[in-house]
């Protein structure tokens, strides 16, 4: 939420003030449950979506922000489910395999979605890396399977797929896995949410404000 000109800075400051007030209205006394960095991420998401309800939908599990900051400082790769998310992330090591030729081949051969196939192809990068999913519940389910069945250990999973088919269920399943994660309750999520979260963590890793 940066700005260059004086007018831009004034707008940014006013916007941040409005966002914070909206968050306070939504959370009430629950606002004390979140630490400073978590509040910074919540502010980013609310700003990106113009939807204060996200303040009560975001779930942080197993110190995900701190783990994400460490992973970014160690220059770990980020694996995403769609190229739109890749385009929005301010980081060099971002990978998306959804359009990889091998993904098309495996998906067709095995009768699975390309999203699932892309996560299987990225398995070695996911292990000790960061996963950011904002669109595909099946991709998130596959990452969870890799964690449970193949002992893959991501540093952080940002799981915020959007939609009314399997999205809520995939995020519930993520919260049951013992890995650092950030997710949303219910069907809401999507690219803007995913990008806002991971860019906030990247900003923290660079010692900037979220």
UniProtKB/Swiss-Prot annotation:
List of residues binding substrate: 15, 44
SUPFAM superfamilies: Precorrin-8X methylmutase CbiC/CobH
Functional pathway: Cofactor biosynthesis; adenosylcobalamin biosynthesis; cob(II)yrinate a,c-diamide from sirohydrochlorin (anaerobic route): step 9/10
Record field: catalytic activity: Co-precorrin-8X = cob(II)yrinate
GO MF: cobalt-precorrin-8 methylmutase activity; precorrin-8X methylmutase activity
Known function: Catalyzes the conversion of cobalt-precorrin-8 to cobyrinate.
UniProt record similarity statement: Belongs to the CobH/CbiC family.
Subunit and interaction comment: Homodimer.
Protein name: Cobalt-precorrin-8 methylmutase
């Amino acid at each position: 939420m940066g700005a260059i000109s004086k007018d831009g800075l004034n707008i940014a400051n006013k916007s941040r003030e409005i966002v914070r007030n909206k968050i306070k209205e939504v959370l009430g006394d629950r606002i004390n449950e979140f630490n400073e960095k978590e509040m910074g991420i919540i502010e980013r998401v609310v700003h990106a979506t113009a939807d204060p309800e996200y303040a009560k939908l975001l779930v942080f599990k197993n110190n995900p922000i701190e783990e994400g900051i460490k992973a970014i400082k160690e220059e770990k790769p980020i694996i995403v489910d769609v190229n739109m998310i890749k385009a929005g992330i301010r980081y060099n090591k971002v990978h998306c395999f959804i359009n990889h030729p091998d993904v098309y081949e495996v998906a067709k051969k095995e009768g699975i979605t390309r999203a699932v196939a892309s996560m299987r192809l990225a398995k070695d990068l996911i292990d000790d890396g960061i996963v950011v999913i904002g669109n595909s519940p099946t991709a998130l389910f596959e990452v969870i399977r890799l964690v449970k069945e193949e002992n893959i250990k991501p540093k952080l999973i940002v799981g915020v797929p959007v939609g009314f088919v399997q999205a809520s269920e995939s995020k519930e399943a993520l919260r049951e896995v013992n890995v650092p994660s950030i997710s949303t309750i219910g069907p809401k999520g999507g690219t803007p949410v995913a990008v806002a979260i991971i860019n906030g963590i990247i900003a923290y890793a660079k010692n900037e404000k979220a």
